[in-house]
Amino acid sequence: VSSDTYCTKEHDSLKISNGKWHWFSRQTGGKTALDYLVKVKGCSFMEAMEIIHGAPLPRTIPAPVSRAESKRLLLPERNGNADTVIRYLKGRGIHDVIIRYCLENNLLFESRKYHSAVFLGYDKDGVPRYGNVRGTVGDYKGELSGSDKHYSFSIPGSSQTVHVFESAIDALSYATLELFEGKNWHEDHLLSLAGVFVTKREDVVPVALSRYLADHPEIQTLRLHLDNDAVGRGAVSGIVGGLRDRYEIWDEPPKCGKDVNDQLKIRVGLKKKEEYSR
């Protein structure tokens, strides 16, 4: 076009001058050969680099994406003793034998700062992965930071039966009732679901139960002791719908009161019997 301006045969509106180029019909331009090859020739970045380099570039294999690391459970500092927690649980009707068992097997401890009851859940390798916190004053309920609900509080047994509860306190309440009956309260597995939720589906199995069954393939029978309310009844329907083809399932809600702890407190005289007893 002139002594310092050039154009190409393919694109007469593309002008090149002093190391820069501009494609007027496309309203685009650039300063480098890489820009030109990508924007004008339609090369990929790697193709353009190979042309500039004059030889194929070595191909690299992307490093495999690792699975997200397991959540790290943040445990609070333990108190020097568990006197407050013991007193609180006894006030809920739970027998001292059951409380001591949990303390001695690191299933339960008292936090130093708030003197709360901390119920721990472990994975199959014995690593704590879940922590349920219950305030000993007031109605506080919560979970430790980093808790994984797949590994909620449980007391493993030696039989082929697991008893399922909504909370750790319900599980300990059931163990106490079994103790009162003179039974071996830790022969069967006891599992807390760490709460349940409302769902419209009829085959939803809580993750804590799914994980526990996967880790304990010997289990053949489920006995459900969920609450006497709409949420508890709905959770039972979900479990039955999702597992009835693989397990023998018994629905055994509390005989009186809203939950198993209510049933225990009524049994030991800490609470009056509710009108909706069943």
Regions found by a protein language model. Give the residues of each.
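Short secondary-structure junctions
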Residues: V1-T5, V97, I249-D251
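Short active-site loop/helix that positions an aromatic residue
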Residues: K39, A171, A175-F180
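TOPRIM fold recognition
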Residues: E178-R278
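Terminal peptide-recognition signature
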Residues: W23, L37, L89, F119, ...
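Short active-site oxyanion
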Residues: S158-V162, T221-L222
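Conserved mixed alpha/beta catalytic, RNA-binding, or beta-rich assembly cores of soluble enzyme
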Residues: V164-I169, G195-V198
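Non-catalytic accessory segments of DNA primases and related replication-initiation nucleases
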Residues: V1-K90
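Basic, glycine-enriched DNA-binding surface that flanks or lies within the catalytic cores of DNA
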Residues: K9, V65-P156
